[in-house]
Amino acid sequence: MLYECVKNKSTIYTFGASHAGILSEELYSRAGGLMLFNPIFGRELMLDSSPITLTSKMERCTGYGKMLAESRADFQSGDVLIVHSVSGRNPVAIEIAAEAKEKKSHVIAVTNLSYSKSVTSRHPSGKRVFELADIILDNHGDIGDACVKISGLEQKVSPTSTVIGAAMLNTIVAELAQKMVDSGIEKPPIFYSANLDG
């Protein structure tokens, strides 16, 4: 799907809110990464927003995802949206995925399928992100994301979604670059580290 998108000169978009947005940052302008990813960033969804509760409020705000999609993306038939949402339940990610689908773009969801299936949608449609996806990449994390149980603590620690998601997507980047070379693209557009000599 991603190779066909590149071959047809279509656009690859990425989106995630709050910590899920770290994967969009990982794919964007990254040493060793491909110059093919177009992130949809919303200032109020970034981790440097204050107060720290703002990102949670904004990702639950019905209508904000549609507005972001309309103002920051130009979804077309054949485009691909990679959307990262661990729970898959919040309106902003659901609406961006729905906007992409409405415009005949493909949707790849990076999510925790067992977590998402254990919660209800916060969007009026009742949908969760995985229900809008053409391809689901399941991070197989624990429900609630944290994975380490410490004696005497009710809340687990050590979330896994970011590191697993980054590993999955960078593996896909490597496979896409290989496919591009195999198809005759001698120099796929790869970022060179700004911290290397030369």
Which stretches of residues belong to each language-model region?
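Glycine-rich phosphate-binding loops that contact phosphosugars or nucleotide phosphates
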Residues: K7, Y13-V173
